[in-house]
Amino acid sequence: MTKNEAKIKAKELVAKMTVEEKISQLVYNAAAIERLGIKEYNWWNEGAHGVARAGTATVFPHTIAMAATFDPELIETIGDVISTEGRIKYNQHVKYNDYDIFKGLTFWAPNINIFRDPRWGRGQETFGEDPYLSSTLGSAFIKGVQGDGEFMKASACSKHFAVHSGPEKTRHGFDAIANLHDMYETYLPAFEKTVESGVSGVMGAYNRTNGEPCCAHSYLLKEVLRGKWGFDGYVVSDCGALRDIYSDHHFVETKAEAAAVSLKNTCDLNCGETYSALIDAYEQDLITEDDITVAAERLFMIRYLLGEFEETRPYSDIPFSKLDCKEHRALNLRAAEQCPVLLKNENSYLPLDKETSKRIAIVGPNALSVTALEGNYNAYSSEYITVADGIRRVFTNADISVEKGANYCDEQLCHWSGFQNMISDGIATAAEADITVLALGLDCSIEGEDTGFDNDYTACGDKKTLYLPATQQKLAEAVCDVCDNVIVVLMCGSAIDLGEKLTNHAKAIIHAWYPGAFGGLAVANILAGIANPGGKLPVTIYKGDHNLPAFEDYSMLGRTYRYIEGDALYPFGYGLSFTTYAYENEKIVSADDKTVRISVDVKNVGDRAGFERVQAYASFTDSRTVTPHFQLCGVKAVELAPGESKNVELEIDRYWLKAVTDEGERVEPDGGIALYIGGHQPDAVSNKLTGYSCKKLEL
C-alpha cells in the first residue's frame, strides 16, 4: 500500500467519525469504535534493542553498543529482526484479543538525540555524540524496522525532538537554550536525515527549547519538521510531556489550553491523559474540528500502512518459531562480539591462551550481573550469559573464582544486610589468581531515565562525575596492588575515566557497554581470541570531568570530539584490534555538487581476521562561523582475512561538507576542505595510540 493510498483510506474512515470518536483516537490507548469495525489500539511499544516489556525476545546490545560497530548494515539487520519478532508477538496478541500496552507495532525507537554530555544517563539509548553517525545508524535501524514491503513491518519513531539530553532531574521544566548554529549543525541533522529516510513517527521531548515546550513548539514542529522537511507522519508526545506544559513549564494555565497548543502545533498523539481535555478545548473554540481531523487522519494512515485493516493481515505467516530462534541468537552473539572497544592492549597481552591460563579471578559488581547486560528499555531473554558465565564456558581448563567485591555505589543497599563492605573478599580472590578480570561499571539503576535515585554519584540517572563510583575505584586500586595481570571489562552506557592508577596498571581495557544477553560470552570470546574486537568509540572519553562545561549548557563549545578543548583520554572513533590494517592508494574518485566519492585500499597486515571500521572525516574553515575540528562524514565496516586487501569506496553527502552559519544555514566553506580516511579520526591522540596517521586528500 502506498502512502497516498493509506492517506485516502484514512481520510474516508475518519470522515465517518464524530468529534468525540476522533478525539478518542488521539491518545496512546486508542479506544475501539465498534460501529466502524475499529479495534482498540495501544500505540506505546518499545524496541530500542529488542521487543521490550512483552515476554521473551532477543536482547541485543544496547544502542550505544550498536553505535560502536560503526556498521549500518549490521544495525539494519538488527532492526529487521526486532520488527520480525514484533510481528510475531503482535500476531499472537491479536489472536488472543490482547490489545494492551507494549503489544502494538508502533515502536518508539530509535533515540537519535546527540550524546552531548557524558553525564547524561540516557546516552546509552543513543548512537553517540556525532550527528553523522546518529543519522546514518538511525536511518539504518529505521529501514530495518519498517522494511520495504507492501506494508510496513513495524513503525519506527525518531525521538526526542529535538534538543534533549538532560538533566533528567529537571527535564519536566527545563529550558534548553541552543543557538541556531548548534541547532542546525548538531541537534537537528539526525532528525532531518531520518525524516528523509522515511521514518513514520517523531516523538517530542519533555523539555522546552528556547522557551517553548518541545511538544507544542511552533518553530520546531510546524516550521521545521512539517514545513522545511515536509514530514507527514505522526508526532507523539513523550509520556506525560503535555501535562508538563501547564504543570511544570507554566507555558499555559489550563489542561485544555495545553491540549490545544499541542494539537495546533501538530502533536497528533498524546502519551498521557492531557488530550482528554480536547473536548473542552473544542467547546471553548481553542481548536477546530479540522485540527482534530488532520491528527486522526495521520494516525490512521499509519495503521493502514501497517496493514491493520487488511482482510489477510500482512506478515501473519511469520512462524512463531522465529521468535528467539537460533539465527537471531547467532546474530545477537555476532553483534555482541563486534560492539566492545579495545582501549588498551599492552604488549599484545590479549588474547589469552585459553588452554594454558590457569587461575583466573573475576572480580567486580558486573561479574555476575544480568542488568549490566541489558541496559534500559530492554527485552527479556530466555538466556543470559554473564561475564563469569562466559569465561567459565570458554576457559574450561582454568581454575576460576568469582567475587563481587563491591556494590555499584557505596550507598547501594544489599538485599538483606544493609551496607556491606566486600572489598576484602575481592582482594583476597585477586591475590590468589594469575589473572584478574575486573568486571566494573554501572547498570540502569545508576545511569538511566529519571531513576529517582540520588546519592554522591548519581542524580536521577545522570552521573555527577566521569570516574567510577568510589567503592569500585577503591576495589580496583586494591586489586592492582595484589595482582600484576589485570584486565578491565567495563560495562556501562557512557564514557568513564578509570583513573590514572588503574589505567596505567591494567594490561588490557575493554569497554563492553551494555552488550546484550550474550555479552558475557562475547567478552570471553574476545579474551580468548575466538573473536577479534573491532568496535570504535561513538563517544569521547574525557580526562576526568574538570574541563566539562556545565551540564545544563547546551552550547557545543568544548563538547565532543568536534569542539573539545585539549586532548581526550580516548578519542571518538578510536579502538584497537588484535590485527593491524594498512591504508594506501587513497584518491578522490569523483565529485559533484551532491556527493564526493573517495576510495582507499585497506589491507589486513596481521595474522588474524578482523573487521575494520573505515572512517572518513572532513576538516574545513569558514570566516563567517565556527567550524568543528573534524566532522565524520563516511563509515564502512569491512571484514578482512589475514593478508587480504580490499578497495573501499565511501560516498560522502555534501551536506556534511558544509559550514553552518550563525543563522543555521549550510554554506560552502570559504577556507577549503580536507578529507581524511583511516581507522580513526585524524587527531594527534588517535595517531599516537594507534601508531599511524590517517590518509589526507584535498578537495
Give the predicted meaning of each segment.
Residues M1-E663, E668-Q681:
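Glycoside hydrolase catalytic-domain context in secreted enzymes
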Residues A684-L699:
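Short beta-strand elements
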